[in-house]
Amino acid sequence: MKKKHRIKKNDEFQAVFQKGKSNANRQFVVYQLDKEEQPNFRIGLSVSKKIGNAVVRNRIKRMVRQAITELKDEIASGKDFVIIARKPCAEMTYEEVKKSLIHVFKRSGMKRIKK
């Protein structure tokens, strides 16, 4: 993911948590916050230390980043998202991760997701 699509700072994460809306499925929780003034969407990832070791957590983050890269044309701009991975995604394949992300984005009311 390019820098313009990342949330890195703690206060930006906290703003999305406190002011945003959340949607979830068994694998992911997605918080979203509307920010009409920004031209792009931004994504922040969080994988708890309760989920496996560092290798497993980094693998999950890589798969989520790749799925977001493939779906970036279908994700609405002007929003901040924080994606929190849950334990079941530790055993998932890339295709399952992508399908699960599409499902949770659809539940959050994003009209541009078509798949």
Swiss-Prot record:
Pfam family, one: Ribonuclease_P
InterPro entries the UniProt entry points to: Ribosomal_Su5_D2-typ_SF, Ribsml_uS5_D2-typ_fold_subgr, RNase_P, RNase_P_CS
GO molecular function: 3'-tRNA processing endoribonuclease activity; ribonuclease P activity; tRNA binding
Keywords: Endonuclease, Hydrolase, Nuclease, RNA-binding, tRNA processing
Entry keyword annotation includes Hydrolase: yes
Catalytic activity: Endonucleolytic cleavage of RNA, removing 5'-extranucleotides from tRNA precursor
GO cellular component terms given for this protein: ribonuclease P complex
Biological processes annotated in GO: tRNA 5'-leader removal
EC numbers on record: 3.1.26.5
Annotated HAMAP family: RNase_P
Subunit structure: Consists of a catalytic RNA component (M1 or rnpB) and a protein subunit.
Function summary: RNaseP catalyzes the removal of the 5'-leader sequence from pre-tRNA to produce the mature 5'-terminus. It can also cleave other RNA substrates such as 4.5S RNA. The protein component plays an auxiliary but essential role in vivo by binding to the 5'-leader sequence and broadening the substrate specificity of the ribozyme.
Membership in a protein family: Belongs to the RnpA family.
Protein name: Ribonuclease P protein component
Organism in which the protein naturally occurs: Bacillus cereus (strain B4264)
